[in-house]
């Protein structure tokens, strides 16, 4: 009896800590997340929980499903982001600028060169949802995940944080990526959901509540364009104001983590950036993650 008791106490004392990863919002900056996951995987760091907000839910969801960062990297480097994720609605006529991508269209609006009727969103998100469906193969939270995973979205009516961990994974990701103004709010059950970055840009608390002992938070807020923003009309003023406000919220969310990965970068960030720029961001994610590995291993060994 004594030996059995000693054995169970010994096993409990040396149980490995649960490690969680919180992947933050950040649009085309998401290549950083790929670099982070590459290093964690190569270092043999097993993730027990993942949560993601906005584009972080996209990368986090694919990894929780596939647990194959090479497959994700291959997809991301060949991705035509404008085609699948930023295609304008068919009912919006772009007569003054002809055939164009959404980015150009949005730019023309911000410059005051084009008028639009008031809509719930410039894009309905169908092409994006179809692509995420294809990638995830209509997988569900309940049956298909290799790593426990949760997604953060924002309830547009109540302003509350909505944590999704049931149903089709692609629906949750699409809801979390529904940037207000760009996409029509995503109808989920009885809610109207939009981008989770409005309320929890780096979902550290969610990962902690899942059961993680050690939480790694990845913030993309310091990845910025290499040119100063042009502030010349009401749209650009509103956009910049929201950006500044969310920057502080991002810091508050990320700083709750035991380890924060917050790369600094100035360079091209458009959704149609060249492949070499994508690779540069991935490598930056790798470099910044390598810096925190000694601390992470120290924290792990302290349990």
Question: Which residues are covered by each model-predicted region?
Answer:
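Patatin-like phospholipase
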Residues: 12-53, 61-303
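Bacterial N-terminal signal peptides
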Residues: 1-8
